Structures are given as structure tokens and as C-alpha cells.
Amino acid sequence: MNTNPNSIRCSDCAGSSRRDFLKTTLAATAATTLGSIPIIGRAAEEAARPKSETLVASLYKSFNEAQRKALCFPWDHLLRTEVDNNWHVTEQHIGSFLNADQQQMVREIFLGLHSPDYAEKVFKQVEDDSGKAGFGDSSIALFGEPGTGQFEFVLTGRHCTRRCDGDSTEGAAFGGPIFYGHAAQGFNERPDHPGNVDWYQAVRANEVFQMLDGKQRAIALRNKGRMEQGSETVKLSGKTQGLPGIPLTELSQDQRGHVRKVMADLLAPFRKEDADEALKYIEAAGFEHLHMAFYKDQDIGSDGVWDVWQLEGPNMVWYFRGDPHVHVWVNVKAQA
């Protein structure tokens, strides 16, 4: 089901060092965290849009018999919980299988799953990474039935797994595991990842590493990141100790505060209700139980600005793999 594009070396490989990039970019990225977004204004903007769940129900009702047979599945179907970096949940692509009105509904559903500040940027990323077909290369599936309390929409493609469930999936932020990523200027990105819509998150994470002393860095810096193996990539351990990297209990108050800024950056692209739910689950399991790890074996440019890193706790994995381009794997659940 997966497809892997051929490696393409970027032709424009000159530029300033990433340390300079970090310095010049931090001021800009500071404005993109959740803490800098006025909550009232953000909520009002999101409230003005049709709710994604409402649009999913309308989409379901619009299907003809052939579409329903191809795209609709029972709630407990195994495909509902799958996640991967480059896959299609169904064989039918929306650009050729849905009519124009239905395609527009899917677009609005996708946009509505993201915050107003990021929705169009993330949509453009999916367009750019999907080749000539653009967003139309995506595929969708619907599980369960509207009005039953068990109903979920899943959209997939290259660098995309998103879900819309109206909290049908109890105790799962974002409706279950999700994936996002970007190959901005070719398969093999330059060390500073120019044009990558997600790289600002790694910029913030590297700030945390710069705040660590030598002893802390020795704990936080590991060799190689986890293997990418579909849903296994985001399997939760349930553990509060012994996870890769440095536990937040070993950080100072200022350092932990900066990790909270990283978390805000990670949640910033998503609609407020999903971001709030994810943070609620993380806090309930104990923010102090998170571990932060950086991986030195996948350092593009060998300059000590870490392209691969993660936050992991007993009930969450947020794995950022920035080599050779950005893949981000996410799974956040309520505490068991």
C-alpha cells in the first residue's frame, strides 16, 4: 500500500549555517506558538467556519451507492486505526472518484481540522507533496454512521493522515494516530530545510538542547531514532521511566518552560478543540513524565543542529524525523 519516491538531491545547496538560521528564525517562530495566539480570537475564527464533523455527515449523505460501497466501512474495521507516512486508506482518489461539490467538502473538512493561522499552509503542503494531482491524490474512508456516536472520517496521502471523529474515539486525541510531514525542496532537504512548513518546530526543540548543560546533553543525545513502521512507530509504552532521552524531572524550571513552548509549537497547526484535548491528556498523565531525546546519527550537515528528535511519555509519542525531509508521527491518548 505504501509508495516510496526516488531520492532527489536538491540542486540549490548553498546557504548560511543552521546556527545562523536558528538565531534569525527564533523571533519569527515565537509568534507562531499557541501562547501568542489570542484564545478568544482564535476560537471566534474557528467558530465562524462550518464544523468539520457537520461537513463529514453531509459528505456521507451525498454519497451514491458506488461511493458508499467503496469508501464506507464498519466502525471496528482495522483500517480505522492505521497510520503511515505515504499511503491511501482506499484505492479511490478523491480527484477522480468524488464530484466537485464533494471534493470541496473534503477540502473544507481538512481545513477545519487546522487552526486559522496554519490551515492554508498545511493544505499547500499536501498539494505540493502530492505531485500533479495535488490534493486530489488524497483518499478518504468513513467508519461507522453519523448520529450513532461512532463515526470517523480519515484522509490519507503522501505525508498526511488526518482524522475527524467528533470525539467518537474515546480517549484519543486527534481521533487516533496522525501523521504530517513535508519535502519542501526535494526528497533530500538542505540542512536548514528552506521552505519546510514544519521545520519551525525543530528550531524550537533545538533551543531546548542549547539550554542544557553537558551532563544533561549526554542524557538527552542518543544515537539513532526509532524505525518508521506504520502504526508500530507510535506504539505507546505506558512507562514513566526508562524512555529515550532526558526526563523533564532532570530539567530546571526555565528549561521545562521551554519544553512547554515546544509543545505549543507542536499543537499550533491544529484546531483548538483537538489541541486542547491533546494537552489535557498529556497533563493528566504528568507533563513531568515526558522525556525529550535528540538523535545524532541523522544530523544533516553534521553541524549539531538536530534534525531528529522526539517527546515521549507514558501516553504520548511525538516523533519528529527531519532526515532526509520531515516526517512527524503523533499519538496521544488518555491515561490508561
Question: Where do the PLM segments sit?
Answer:
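Signal peptide processing junction and immediate N-terminal pro/mature segment
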Residues: 38-43
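Well-ordered, non-transmembrane segments within structured domains
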Residues: 18, 22, 239-242
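A cross-kingdom marker for long, charged
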Residues: 45-65, 69-336
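Short non-domain terminal segments
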Residues: 19, 32-37, 292, 318
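Short, polar/charged, Gly/Pro-enriched helix-capping and turn/loop motifs at alpha-helix termini
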Residues: 28, 35-36, 120, 273
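Intrinsic disorder/low-complexity segments
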Residues: 15, 28-32, 44-45, 182-185
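N-terminal secretory signal peptides
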Residues: 1-20, 30, 34
